[in-house]
Structure formats: C-alpha cells, structure tokens
Amino acid sequence: MNRFLIIDGLNLVRRIHAAQPNENDVNGLPERVTSACRKLLSKHNPSHVTLVWDGDAISWRKKLYDDYKKGRKPMPEALSQALPALKQHLAERGFHSIDAIAEADDVIATLASKMVQAKGEAIIVSTDKGFTQLLSPQIQLWDHFNQQAITIEDRERQLGVDRSQFIDFLAMAGDSGNKIPGIPGIGPKSACELLKTFRTLANVYASLDKIGAKQAKKLEEGRALARLSYKLVQLQTDIPLNTRLANFRVELTAKA
C-alpha cells in the first residue's frame, strides 16, 4: 500500500529554527531540516514524501475575514531569505516540494484526501491541530517534536466533543490561536453542552425555541459569525493540483 508522508514545511522549519538563540542565524539550517526529514522517513517508511510550503498570496480565509491569524509573529527575515536555498538543498536530496499559492493547509488536506481515494495512507507531519478534522484510519497526524501521533481521541478529550463535531464546536466557541471569532458569549463550555444536546450546529439553530431565551439570543445574533467561523475552520480537500503522485516517490537519495 502506498503511504504518503506530507510535511507541513514552515511548521517544521520554523520550529527547528526557533531553537536557535539568534533568530538571524541560519547556519546549519539545511542540514538540521534534512536530518529531521530523514528521521521522519525512517520512522514512517513512506512510499512518497513531499514538503508543502505556504505561499505569499493573501489566503481566501484572510480575504473573507481580515482578522484571521492576525497578530502572529512574522517569520524572521533571515529565515525568509534562506528558504529558496533550503528548498533546493532538500530537493537535491530527494525531498521535493509543493509551493501553495497562499496557505499550505488546504493543499495538505487535498493531498491526504486524494491519497485515501487512491486506496493509500497519508501521514501529515504538523503540530497544527486543525488537521485533526481529517483524521481517519487512513490519515494520521504526527507531531515530530514530541514524537507522537495526535489522535482523534486526544482531540475529543481536549474539546469535549465527538470527532464529527470538531468543526461545529469551533464555529461556536471560536479558536483564539487562529483568531476564529466564533459566537460572542458562547464559549467552549456552552458549545460543548449545546452539541451534547443537539449533536450538530444545524440542529442547534433549528432548536432555538428549545433553548433558554438569553442563550438563544446570543446564538441568533451570532448566526452570521458562526457561519463565517465554520468556513474558516473547514479545510478544503479539492484544491486543483497540477502534479502527479509519481513526482513524490521516495528516492534513494532521500534514504541515504
């Protein structure tokens, strides 16, 4: 069975670089990143591998909601300037890349989904828990830095809801890390209780007459933000990709 190792490029590289005392010091970065990639190959033994990188264009999520991911620390300039040479270094060693137009997330989600459609498996390497909405027996999420899988069960315990409710939960409760607004006045506890009672966001809105007046008012006033938040959280799995799986087959140079 084919197994596709899909590495969230900047998620990996920025964390490796952050271990440096001086953010302007990129000496040895290509070797450290290559070493990490080879360890991932050894751990997961994939048939295919790629790194997916964020692009420079404004993402559709940012266009939809200007506060999306607002306030995040920008990439150090030295690291930004080092990326082209880093990608070339990796390619020469068998680790080829896909450059997203904007965010890498939807490209990663599309690659993983297409691999499953082709009766294969996908392992996403990232610490971004947004990918947990994709998890299934065929799609895994691996945290390289803690050397452990991020499982559906972990996320269920963290949020207090079932796997099928992850997106609905965040649409109501929001996600401060990504500046997803959610519904004002409906925090994680309320979102969890509502989903335990009504199962889905759609059912919540179909049952406002069964909810206390104060909370129902918050839900009604926040309906548009809930719809917006749902769109922001949900990963797209059908991004057009002008590439072939064969381009990412693991090469002997990557295993060396």
Swiss-Prot record:
CDD domains: H3TH_53EXO (cd09898), PIN_53EXO (cd09859). Mg(2+) binds at D105. GO terms for biological process: DNA replication, Okazaki fragment processing. Residues 185-190 are annotated as: Interaction with DNA. InterPro entries: 5-3_exonucl_a-hlix_arch_N, 5-3_exonuclease, 5-3_exonuclease_C_sf, DNA_polI_H3TH, FEN, HhH2, PIN-like_dom_sf, Xni. SMART domains: 53EXOc (SM00475), HhH2 (SM00279). Residues 164-250 form the 5'-3' exonuclease domain. Binds 2 Mg(2+) per subunit. Only one magnesium ion has a direct interaction with the protein, the other interactions are indirect. Binds 1 K(+) per subunit. The potassium ion strongly increases the affinity for DNA. Its cofactor is Mg(2+); K(+). Keywords: DNA-binding, Endonuclease, Hydrolase, Magnesium, Metal-binding, Nuclease, Potassium. It holds the Pfam family 5_3_exonuc. Gene3D superfamilies: 5' to 3' exonuclease, C-terminal subdomain, 5'-nuclease. K(+) binds at M172, A173, P181, I183, I186. It is an enzyme of class 3 (hydrolase). GO terms for molecular function: 5'-3' exonuclease activity; 5'-flap endonuclease activity; DNA binding; magnesium ion binding; potassium ion binding. Its EC number is 3.1.-.-. Belongs to the Xni family. Has flap endonuclease activity. During DNA replication, flap endonucleases cleave the 5'-overhanging flap structure that is generated by displacement synthesis when DNA polymerase encounters the 5'-end of a downstream Okazaki fragment. This is Flap endonuclease Xni. It comes from Shewanella loihica (strain ATCC BAA-1088 / PV-4).
